[in-house]
Amino acid sequence: MQFYEASPAWNPEQRDCAGLVRFAWREALRRHDRAWFQRMGAGYEPFAPDVRAYDLERGPLGEKLFRTGFGAFREEDLLNGKFSEFADARTLKSFNTVFVSRDRRQAQAGDLIFFYQPWVQKYPYHVMIFIGEARRAAEGANDWVVYHTGSSPHDEGTVKKVRLAVLDHHPDRRWRPLESNPNFLGFYRLKILE
């Protein structure tokens, strides 16, 4: 939905590629009641049932959903800083997902797509969300992704919705989601979905 109209509930200071994932993850785990729809803004409609296995408001992690270090979950992790409200793209990839494949035929809706651009010194990792068949304007395709372009001091960036088939021909080869591209790390699934 952020592609069509950014929710006022999405903090403008966190609008980047990983911020889109964090926002979507949190909001997916909330109860989608009348108060939620009012908070999200006009135009939001139900598109999936609530996640019954986890309730953000009552869960042990609260808003601190993102693991920040290696290791299997232990009870003391809830108190020792192993979980945070923030995760950049690298942290999402390293501690919160499992590798699926570089083959797009293995991807499922909700999987994350990671790129690594080592020449970008501050944030070399970039993440996109694979949505598969889009709810609106799918054009009969099932290879849609959404992502935030990132912001700069002069540009707040934007959320884009594009097909993998279009990205396959991106003018900069480093952004092509092809198995032959070493900058394309592949598809990853959130550990919470495993």
Predicted regions and their residues:
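Second-shell loop/turn segments in exported
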Residues: 3-14, 99-101, 116-118
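Secretory/export targeting leaders with adjacent low-complexity proregions
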Residues: 16-17, 22, 43, 47-50
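Short acidic alpha-helical/loop segments enriched in Asp/Glu that coordinate divalent cations
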Residues: 33-42
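Low-complexity, Gly/Ser/Thr/Pro-rich intrinsically disordered linker/tail segments
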Residues: 140-194
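...with weaker cross-activation on analogous glycine-rich loops/strands in unrelated enzymes
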Residues: 44-154
